Amino acid sequence: MNEDLICGLDATQIEELKQDKGALVLVSVNFGENVHQAIFREPTFKDLQAMSKISKSDELKGLSAVYDNCIIKADEEIENRDLLKIKAVSALMERARKTTSEAKNL
């Protein structure tokens, strides 16, 4: 049986991570002709507060903090290249910005 792996993990391992870490986000980074993937846990308020505070003085350190705190597993190319880490975290944060919500009176 040839099962598709994501960041070297099979479906069972990913389900176990979901149980342990909560909601997971898969990010794909296109670089040249290759697609690299990273699995993040959703950032918490604590993660976002730290990023916001750090980003006021150094935006790249803020992105690095999110990567370090939220990464679960990444393809080797992302792990070894800061540019790809930045793109992966940027996609993670953009996902939060694209999430919509609505409030209305009851």
Feature roles, as predicted:
Residues 28-106:
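Short, surface-exposed, charged amphipathic helix/loop patches that serve as local interaction elements
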Residues 1-48:
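Short, charged/polar N-terminal "headpieces" of proteins
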